[in-house]
Amino acid sequence: MLFLVVFLHLYRFTFGPQHPAAHGVLCCLLYFCGEFIVYIDCIIGYLHRGTEKLCEYKSVEQCLPYFDRLDYVSVCCNEHLLSLCFEYMLRCCLSLRCAFMRLLIVEFTRSFNGLLCISCMVLDLGCLSPLLWSFEERDKLMTFFDLCCGCRMHLAFMVLLGILDDFVFGFVDFLLLLIISCLFVMDCYDLLFVGNRLFYLRLRGLSFFDLYDLVFNSLSGVLSRSLGMVWDCRLFSCYELYFMFCYDYCFCFIGDAFDRLFLRLFDMRMSLLICKQCFFVGFFVFGFVCLFDYLYCDITIETIIMLFYSLWCCCLPGISFACVEHPKGEYCLLLCFCVGLCSRLRLRCADFLHICLLDVCLRGFLLHDLVAVLGNIDVVFGSVDR
């Protein structure tokens, strides 16, 4: 009997954390057989700030700034998760006007995140012009955030039991022009990316996931819908007012990088259509924008000191859970509340689970495919290294 024994010599390379495509905070140990990747060992934690620990034994409004810094591309979606979880515990309902305004800013944030994800992925593939083009629309969206709350990055727009302030009267014209402009840009993006033969040949067949990864590794968001999973928290969990809107739902079956690019473009378009419906309905609904309005407080130094030191919104000890459809996937929050303070807080961030599967989806591919896939799965390390 003849036995054939083949000895493979593996080469080990270190990718990152200094590499720009690794965001400066990701280290990958790559094992190669020739030019092909055999195994990837991801080393994370270079940006670790202990967010969950820092939020312990603080009031919920003191935890909001930490959530701003989790996924610093989708700030309002992070704030929305914490506010929603606390409101579930209080079992309170917001006014229709406040709910519409929340959805408007959340869906604009989803488009804001998608623009950066797609443009940076295309930059990793070697194209510079789409990055500069997308930043024009991102600057318009930042101007929208600035008009809403006076900030461009760390917004602090969603306060507990409401939003920061009502929109100003002259804001309506700018908002309508912004929605029309973004919808026009989405048409151009479809022609540039989906209808482009070069992008199709480069991304089709790159980094497959399968149904085993979907079930046992908890894929969510765009990655799960690219495998044919008909699931979207906005559509099936019915949180906030998403059941009142008319929008389409899309999923693919191959599960490669091109499907994920197509679904991100589709999600951005649907977010803008939801914003359009919010604009035509929400601005004609009257109501309070916050159940506890600071504007009607007596503006004296004693009142300011009282608001600063007091726990203004307390509830009975308990546990609350909330899950939202974040631009990265499903974000879940478990909040334990006791004596007016947040005693325990646990986050389930989708991009942390997605980056753990780099080894699965890149075996047999080349080094330059790793850079393309890192941009394609949309990872922000503020939430990965929380």
From Swiss-Prot:
Its main location: mitochondrion. SUPFAM superfamilies: HydB/Nqo4-like (SSF56762). One of its GO terms (molecular function) is NADH dehydrogenase (ubiquinone) activity. Keywords: Electron transport, Mitochondrion, NAD, Oxidoreductase, Respiratory chain, Translocase, Transport, Ubiquinone. It holds the Pfam family Complex1_49kDa. Its EC number is 7.1.1.2. It is an enzyme of class 7 (translocase). It catalyses: a ubiquinone + NADH + 5 H(+)(in) = a ubiquinol + NAD(+) + 4 H(+)(out). GO terms for cellular component: mitochondrion. Belongs to the complex I 49 kDa subunit family. This is NADH-ubiquinone oxidoreductase 49 kDa subunit homolog.
